[in-house]
Amino acid sequence: MSQKLQKPSFLSEYLRSIRLFSKKCVRPSGKELSMSIKRHAIGIGFLGILGYAIKLIHIPINNIIVSSPGKE
């Protein structure tokens, strides 16, 4: 019986600690947030361009390997 009573208190204590932690956290300003979003967008764009370039280079190489001169 006492274990059933402790579960809600554990949960409420856990939620209370989460609330206190989130209040103590320092949130970024609008300028810092926009700078972070821009950096993430540039990084994602760079990875997309890099993936496209690798695919573009490997397609002709794959076609050369697959279509060997001995096969018709």
From Swiss-Prot:
<keyword id="KW-0472">Membrane</keyword>
<protein>
    <recommendedName>
        <fullName>Probable protein transport protein Sec61 subunit gamma</fullName>
    </recommendedName>
</protein>
<comment type="similarity">
    <text>Belongs to the SecE/SEC61-gamma family.</text>
</comment>
<keyword id="KW-0812">Transmembrane</keyword>
<feature type="topological domain" description="Cytoplasmic">
    <location>
        <begin position="1"/>
        <end position="40"/>
    </location>
</feature>
<dbReference type="Pfam" id="PF00584">
    <property type="entry name" value="SecE"/>
</dbReference>
<comment type="function">
    <text>Necessary for protein translocation in the endoplasmic reticulum.</text>
</comment>
<dbReference type="InterPro" id="IPR001901">
    <property type="entry name" value="Translocase_SecE/Sec61-g"/>
</dbReference>
<keyword id="KW-0813">Transport</keyword>
<keyword id="KW-0653">Protein transport</keyword>
<keyword id="KW-0811">Translocation</keyword>
<keyword id="KW-1133">Transmembrane helix</keyword>
<dbReference type="GO" id="GO:0005789">
    <property type="term" value="C:endoplasmic reticulum membrane"/>
</dbReference>
<keyword id="KW-0256">Endoplasmic reticulum</keyword>
<dbReference type="InterPro" id="IPR008158">
    <property type="entry name" value="Translocase_Sec61-g"/>
</dbReference>
<dbReference type="InterPro" id="IPR023391">
    <property type="entry name" value="Prot_translocase_SecE_dom_sf"/>
</dbReference>
<feature type="transmembrane region" description="Helical">
    <location>
        <begin position="41"/>
        <end position="61"/>
    </location>
</feature>
<dbReference type="GO" id="GO:0006605">
    <property type="term" value="P:protein targeting"/>
</dbReference>
<comment type="subunit">
    <text>Heterotrimeric complex composed of SEC61-alpha, SEC61-beta and SEC61-gamma.</text>
</comment>
<dbReference type="GO" id="GO:0008320">
    <property type="term" value="F:protein transmembrane transporter activity"/>
</dbReference>
<dbReference type="GO" id="GO:0006886">
    <property type="term" value="P:intracellular protein transport"/>
</dbReference>
<feature type="topological domain" description="Extracellular">
    <location>
        <begin position="62"/>
        <end position="72"/>
    </location>
</feature>
